[in-house]
């Protein structure tokens, strides 16, 4: 038998249900529903038929406790929307299975619990289209007892949760709801929304769900045990909309999102909890999946690293926060027209940001990478800019006509003389504003008469670094005069010039002339040769006279 989850699929873990029972049983009368076979006629299944009750009277009133027994099966099935319960306050059952609908006619609170003797049985919700007073409501699983985890498990082959309308899963704080059956559409294209501060854990067959309307995270935590593939994964074949809450792995193993993503609020990816800190990857499925920034959104990377392979679009702004790293890979083209703010953590840009929107890197945040940003980019005071990949790999970062404004710390690494592969470089087609500090980290010394193009191509330059410091194979700082920074390190002189963006190393003592190009270095030895030649020519003329 296929168990079907019809209806609004609104399962809420928060306010009432499992575990509540009247404390003064003796003050209530008990009526037992017999219900015949429960399979042959609506008369035998009706709660409003007096003959179906052992008292031959339909129980009503607040002093009545309706106890339900099944004479032919250990599972009672309430089958029809026409069934109703009076104003009783408790249904006591061993194991109960709701197929399509449970309807109650009063505004009372109903507690559905397992009250069997000895080892407790199983409480099963197979279909939950709950109607109270003619209005669709939610069945709520209460955390008022010792219950902390609620598990909906797949016990028979072919059991699925089938959606006949869209709805909400509400999991209260301190509670975890685990779903293992596959979730699929029963008719139409249905959506599932997660609210509440508790944990929804998707495991088993639920990680291969196929419902097409999409999954919306609007509160609490959602974690998943297996990532699936595009079209068959924990979030179905529709978009994953992130409005509020946290997405994390069920373990320390990384997990992937294989759905189109809609950013529409504030969401956290990953976790600082060592039990759930697996990295999150947002996959593109060979470019078929993309991210829409529907409104001004905040993505917090709680820890670790999130690789974002999807391209972006939309009019919203994107703010990155948290201690972790977001890496927009070479698979991603960022075309959203709202601004991008790195409020905390690290933005590792390997992709191409084609929109003209501004990028800002705040205090204690970092921008690194070898990608391209077209819009105006500002490294604010306290922020860090480091071209190249994290961990010492060098590279070239490219900025478009929007230019680059530096007011924080710029860190560039030098391990040789080949631009991009051995030392960091910055290409800029727009204006360059110097500011903040520049730290040059050397791995090895440079040969005499070497010139490095640190900053290249800018349309104009302005401002000054507050300091230029060298570390590693060279140690010390450079002093500035009229836009030229100079430092002496052993037998070499190192010079950085604002107007060219070049770093030049020559022997000491030396006179350095940069005649508009790299490598146009005139040393003292050259001057001496020319001076000697001039003296020789003068002596020759004197002899001839």
Task: State each model region's role.
Residues 58-78, 99, 348, 386, ...:
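Glycine-rich repeat segments that build the extracellular carbohydrate-interaction surface of secreted
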Residues 29-61, 120, 144-237, 269-363, ...:
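Extracellular repeat-rich scaffold modules on cell surfaces
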Residues 508-527:
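A short, hydrophobic C-terminal helix/tail in secreted or cell-surface proteins
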Residues 523-545:
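C-terminal membrane-anchoring or membrane-association module
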Residues 4-5, 16-68, 271, 409, ...:
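Extracellular/surface-exposed low-complexity segments
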Residues 1-12, 23, 510, 527-531:
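Bacterial N-terminal signal peptides that target proteins for export
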Residues 45, 275, 363-459:
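Extracellular beta-strand/loop-rich repeat segments of large surface/secreted proteins
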Residues 70-94, 237-245, 251-260, 355, ...:
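N-terminal extracellular ligand-recognition/capping segment immediately after the signal peptide
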